[in-house]
Amino acid sequence: EEIVDGKSERGSHPVERFPLRQWMLRITSYADRLINELDDLNWSESIKDMQRNWIGRSTGAEVDFFVGWAPPTNPIDENAGGIEAGGQSPPYENWKASRAQAGFPEKPGDDVLRVYTTRPDTLFGATYMVIAPEHSFVEKLTTPEQKEAVDTYVRQSSLKSDLDRTDLAKDKSGVFTGSYAINPINGEKIPVWIADYVLISYGTGAIMAVPAHDERDWEFAVKYDIPIVTVVSPADAEDGTRRREDAKKTGSDEVLSDLVSSREPTEVFSGKGVAVNSGKFDGTPTDEFKAKITDELEAAGLGSEAVNFKLRDWLFSRQRYWGEPFPIWHELDADGNRTGLMRVDSADELPVILPEMEKFKPTGTPEPMLSTAPESWLYKTAEDGTKLKRETNTMPQWAGSCWYYLRFADPKNSDCFLDPEVEKSWLPVDLYVGGAEHAVLHLLYARFWHKVLFDRGHVSTCEPFQKLVNQGMILGEADPETGKAEKMSKSRGNVINPDDVVDAYGADSLRLYEMFM
């Protein structure tokens, strides 16, 4: 699951992204609870902060940028007669008027790129847009002249991991789609680019780029010679409020002149301040401007206040053989194609047992290797005559590791996974001893799993682990020159056999020693 230079960490095999229809668990529905209920736990603040930051709750606004000009030609092609003098065309004006009447829709249409931003106050400084290489609008927005360059770039991006793509130290890259969008706050035409520093998994997979106030956008704009416009001055917010009030009294914009820096800044400013180059909002402090611009966007049907999370829904399927099969069947039509309807195995058909197979290697296609399982396991006919095909994805190891502590309390129960009286007697876990490296994976997933079981009435508490203690981490030999050392791990081949210590001092002594390092 680690990718280095487009190859797997183990074996150095080429890794490529494929679009797959997979199973997801909607952990985002529990995001607020996963944050708020941390306060009641006897865990270190550092671990709590790691989970809070991983979930990454933020407030901001969703904003729609119009791109619905005349696909498949350039959405705003000045040479095709699709744009009037002044940079706008009837379709945009009609769209804007329609939005003013209907309001901001819950889901964006095919004529807009929707973005999420924590800084709607910087909207006047958006000089270009970026969509992720996987965005559904890539084909729609790519002009014939740019198709070859876009196809090449998208292919290259598919070989990179998300970590590589978002590494701040790496050079930014991108490709112009040939198309433009309209900035809804000032009506200006701005180009739409594709760049892999934008991830499809965060927000909407599209951003409004404000290079004067974002480091990544700045680097990209400088590289591709895109305009950079300052819209936030680092002037004192209270000073800005006073000057704005003075300007109102005098009726002159000159009072604000010393707040406005050059439209072409020499460095990035990402903090709070007062608005500049923002029309009637000049001099407005950042927090006040955020609220005002959001209200104005909502009134015009162009945007809305929104909450977003860095946390994504949990990908819960794998294409390998070894894993718990999903107890799900897909209905097939007369031609053997899926209809979209599904059925589940009955209780007396559980658990689903993996078929015996001689070959376990991947198929070389996006299809799970269980798609080559014997037909007797793969297909069946329902009592009503409907032909069914078994789901061939398998569950990840998390399917077992998220709730093992519950089964420990009642391991021999063949009637249910955990007797209610036993659960009330033994749980929640009083003390969990585990490494800090589990903070945003196992510990977060187990909390989510437990909350789902709590909501379903299977456990009596909403949290699984009351107290958490992190033991030390064993390191391998350090480099004598740099002092750097990797953790001791089987995958790194730097382990020491503990048998000698166990023979001399006993296993419990070794365990306690490790716990209190």
Report the location of each language-model feature:
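Residue patterns forming the tRNA-binding/recognition surfaces of aminoacyl-tRNA synthetases
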Residues: E1-G68, W95, R99, F104-K107, ...
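Conserved catalytic micro-motifs used in adenylation/nucleotidyl-transfer and phosphoryl/amide-
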Residues: K7, E62-F65, D111-T122, Y180-P184, ...
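Conserved active-site neighborhood of enzyme catalytic/cofactor-binding cores
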Residues: K7-S8, S179, Y202-S233, S317-M517
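Amphipathic alpha-helical
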Residues: M24-S58, A132-F176, L350-L378
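Conserved oxyanion/phosphate-binding beta-strand-loop segments in alpha/beta enzyme cores
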Residues: D40-W43, Y153-W193, D384-E421
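Structured, non-catalytic alpha/beta "coupling" segments that mediate domain-domain communication
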Residues: P120-K140, Y321-E331, D335, L341
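Catalytic alpha/beta core of large soluble enzyme barrels
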Residues: H135-P234, E267
